[in-house]
Amino acid sequence: MEKEVIVVGAGLAGSEAAYQLAKRGIKVKLYEMKAKKKTPAHSKDYFSELVCSNSLGSDSLENASGLMKEELRILGSLLIEVADKNRVPAGQALAVDRDGFSEEVTKILKNTKNIEIIEEEFTEFPNDKIVIIASGPLTSDKLFQKISEITGEESLYFYDAAAPIVTFESIDMNKAYFQSRYGKGDGEYINCPMNKEEYYNFYNELIKAERAELKNFEKEKLFDACMPIEKIAMSGEKTMTFGPLKPKGLINPKTEKMDYAVVQLRQDDKEGKLYNIVGFQTNLKFGEQKRVFSMIPGLENAEFIRYGVMHRNTFINSTKLLDKTLKLKNKDNIYFAGQITGGEGYVTAIATGMYVAMNVANRLENKEEFILEDISEIGAIVNYITEEKKKFQPMGANFGIIRSLDENIRDKKEKYRKLSERAIEYLKNSIKGV
């Protein structure tokens, strides 16, 4: 096999994979078509664009996403390093200035030795080179057709949604207030409180608001993590108060009481000029978003610098198709990484990009496969998406898929800390000599 690797897609997984291979002295051709042909969800030409949210999840080791990020730091992840540098206040979460993050990743990759960037759509698979498909949740129709031909699988897809962003100066802070749930962090979230009447007025307008038309809408499959707010509302009149609008853990400083419902906004840029409406991914038409979301107390005169959008997300049946290195079982030179594998979320995408790159590098250097067991969070997610099962649904980082402890610990926080400690020790031992 020629010691040159083709990486398709400069999203989170592809960017990480390309960098890790290049750093190990392997030549990489990185295909990214955005400069000439954007997907429905992308707006910038930068690599590793964060589409849905600017948060990479909790940084706490009592959280599986926090553990996965720590594992990536141990492995030397470029993207987590850049995320740490571009952090914005968000309590225990690792949220980033999304433009600053993507700009820095792009600059590094364009200036890294051994990486050649090709701004074209990739559609033809060579037989003499390793190809890593990291084309993401918005894989082009032509490429996905080629993948379908190679794998023999029909296209599987669902729809993701992205939340609106408003300017801080347009938020009425006489009505809204800063506070983090349960007092964690430094009160970085903006909270827009609703009384019962305001909530039901908002609810009634939301469920009847006009939505954008989608192709094959009847076939949609949605993740709870990116479920459109109108879909949540339509599942029950109080459902939002147990989800994105839950008031628990928040005390309104103006009334010193808990409100009936609360809409939270999270800082989206380093300067604190922009805030995204947490959990408000949506498929409403832009005019309807302005009308309905302006009913939220504090957002009556909000300036929307980006409206929410909805877009298709594709993934393959990884449990049937991929081995433990994320290589196709029936095609020796093709690997997959990122959300197209069914690994859900930003951090999982980075992790699979790192994992595939390490395995491809080892293969080209005639070393043993780098297989992580489900003791680590990265190993657990790889195990989940490659272990054959009757019904495969995408999965993100969580402690439910990691191997249980030998001891039974009732306290969840203590148990999660123990799982994280064991995972970190295991990973450090696993990379000795790698």
Curated annotation (Swiss-Prot):
Subcellular location: Cytoplasm
Coarse class of the protein's main subcellular location: cytoplasm
EC category name: transferase
Cofactor: FAD
Gene3D superfamilies to which the protein is assigned, alphabetical: FAD/NAD(P)-binding domain (3.50.50.60)
EC number: 2.1.1.74
Catalytic activity line of the entry: uridine(54) in tRNA + (6R)-5,10-methylene-5,6,7,8-tetrahydrofolate + NADH + H(+) = 5-methyluridine(54) in tRNA + (6S)-5,6,7,8-tetrahydrofolate + NAD(+); uridine(54) in tRNA + (6R)-5,10-methylene-5,6,7,8-tetrahydrofolate + NADPH + H(+) = 5-methyluridine(54) in tRNA + (6S)-5,6,7,8-tetrahydrofolate + NADP(+)
Cited Pfam families: GIDA (PF01134)
Residues binding FAD: G9, A10, G11, L12, A13, G14
Family: Belongs to the MnmG family. TrmFO subfamily.
HAMAP family per UniProt: TrmFO (MF_01037)
Protein name as catalogued: Methylenetetrahydrofolate--tRNA-(uracil-5-)-methyltransferase TrmFO
Organism: Fusobacterium nucleatum subsp. nucleatum (strain ATCC 25586 / DSM 15643 / BCRC 10681 / CIP 101130 / JCM 8532 / KCTC 2640 / LMG 13131 / VPI 4355)
